[in-house]
Each structure stands twice: as structure tokens, then as C-alpha cells.
């Protein structure tokens, strides 16, 4: 009801803050643009004055079936990761809920509702947890394939890409038949030790091998994959190293050369929560260091990376790049107040990694989440 009256709501805080930093790709703006022509049909004609819907038509499915996940990322927590629940339980903390939080108490009712709308859906987004290890993802794909709509729907994934098979099914066989597909690979580091710390217990070689498989099999203009790091206080200073790794190992997707999409996606996610890992919450000395690293990155990217792209997309790619980098500076110029004790130990574990320390295990991760 508040939204219908043009009032801000607490649930949209993330979009408001990201738009303040200059993000033009927030969910709010994206869906207003894509489904704006359906406003009269879906909102005005279907919504009562008190905000209730008379009928519901699901043109877009946004699936986060449960918190089932095989990683315990430093920037995540038990609500979105079953592995985090397991780790916290081993620490004696059992107050964080179920290991597998489902999106519906009645799975049969949920699937009956969804299946009943399968003939009108035009976009499906799979997130998590980790969607590629969730049985519901597999069941949905099987049904969509059975009604011959795999090639008629736009599919979007957010995945850690640690594995691309479920039971005896390699999802690449489905993906090759999707005419409109985009896979967003959540990868925050290209150094094995640092990745294992930030996205425990991810193994870089396995992810890179799966990226190569995507490059080999997703060959059409509308079959794309992108990397979407979560930029935060622990990895933003290595943004140049990250892109350099993809360049030196010939890992750029085809879409990198053909559009400015790469510039938008790779810089899109600037962490807001947990706020003690946000670059806005960094101590002043670290903010100054990040600004210097971003300046070096800007010059290098325009000099070394932009010329690799097809000539007709270089100008728009520079414009997109400049816009996205400005968001980092806006975030650094913002301030989030947190307890000063966070700053005392925040960078210590990764400083040890930089000095080639071999002491790295899950306890570092639980400490970093708990500080």
C-alpha cells in the first residue's frame, strides 16, 4: 500500500542506497523498465485499495528455494547458506534456524501453483543458496523441458559454479538449448588462498574449469555468462589483479568483446551488508588505499582492456566503466558507523595470507563473521 502511494519502504533499503551511489541496475529500476507496460494489467486492474491482489500472474519467477549451499562465504550467513548453519552449530551456536530453509511450508502446493503458470512465464531467475545443487531447480527445468518451453523463456542464474551437474544430469545440456541465457558467476578472488578464505571452501581450479566449459558451450549472442564479484573491504584493493587474471588466462566471455555488459556486471555488486565488510565502513587509511588502487585500475583498464573489445563497443564500454567506477568512489565517500573494534582485526587474516601464511582453515571464516 505504501508503494502504491509512492512512499519508501524498509524492504527496499538496498535499492535506495545503491541508487544513491549511482547504480542504474537496481531491481527496482530494472523491473520498472522491463514490466512497465504491464503496470495497468498487473497493478491498477488487479490490486484493491488496501494493496491486496485479486489475481496473480507470474511472468517472472525469482527462485531462492532454500539456503542449501556448499559454501560459507565471509560476506554471507546462515539465512542464505546451510554450510554456515553447520559451522555455527559446531561452534555451539544453534540459534540460527534450520539447515535447509525452504521457501514454502507446502512444497506440493508451491509446485502446483508454479507449474500452473509455466505456460505464461517469460523469465526465470535461479539464485540460492546455491541453485545448481538444489533439487527444486532440477525439477523445474525438467518440467519446462517437458512442455517444450526451454527455448522460449529467458533464464538467469546466480551461481558459485563450483559444480554444474546434479545426479546424472549435466546442466550444460539444458543450457545449450536455451536461446536466452545469462549465468552470473559469483567469484570474489583469483588467488586460491584468499578465495578459500572469502568463499570457504571454494576451490579455484574447479571453478575455472567450469568457466572454460561455459566458454566452449555457450556460443550464441544470447547465451552469456559474466563474473559478478561482491566487492567489499577484503577484495576491492585487488580489483585490477582480478581482471588481469581473466585477461592473462584468456577467460573473457564472448560478451566481453561484443558489448558493455561486462563493465556493468563485473562492477555491479558493491557490498552493503554485513555493513562491517562494506567499503563505506572501512577506516580512513584503507579508504585512501582503495582510492589509489581504483585510480591505478582505471588507467590500466582503459589502456590495456578496452582496446581488446570490438571497436564499435569501445566508446560505450568506457562510458559504462566510468559510471560504474564512480559508484565505488561514492561508496568510499559515504560513511557507515560501526563499532570501532571491527576495524582492529578486520584485515589481519588476509594480511597473513598476503605474507604467504599457510594457517588457513574454517576457523578464520567463523572469526571474520563473528567480529
What is each model feature region?
Residues 1-101, 117-119, 309-359:
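N-terminal pre-core extensions flanking Radical SAM catalytic domains
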Residues 5, 111-117, 142-148, 172-176:
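Leucine-rich repeat
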Residues 8-11, 61, 110-113, 140, ...:
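Alpha-helical packing segments of well-folded alpha/beta enzyme cores
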Residues 10, 71, 192-193, 365:
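Glycine-centered loop/turn positions within well-structured domains
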Residues 58-68, 79-106, 118-136, 147-167, ...:
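Core AdoMet radical
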Residues 136-142, 166-174, 238-240:
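Distinct, well-ordered alpha-helical segments
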Residues 156, 178-184, 203-357:
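Conserved C-terminal portion of the radical SAM core fold
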Residues 356, 360-371:
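Single conserved hydrophobic/aromatic residue that forms the stacking wall/gate
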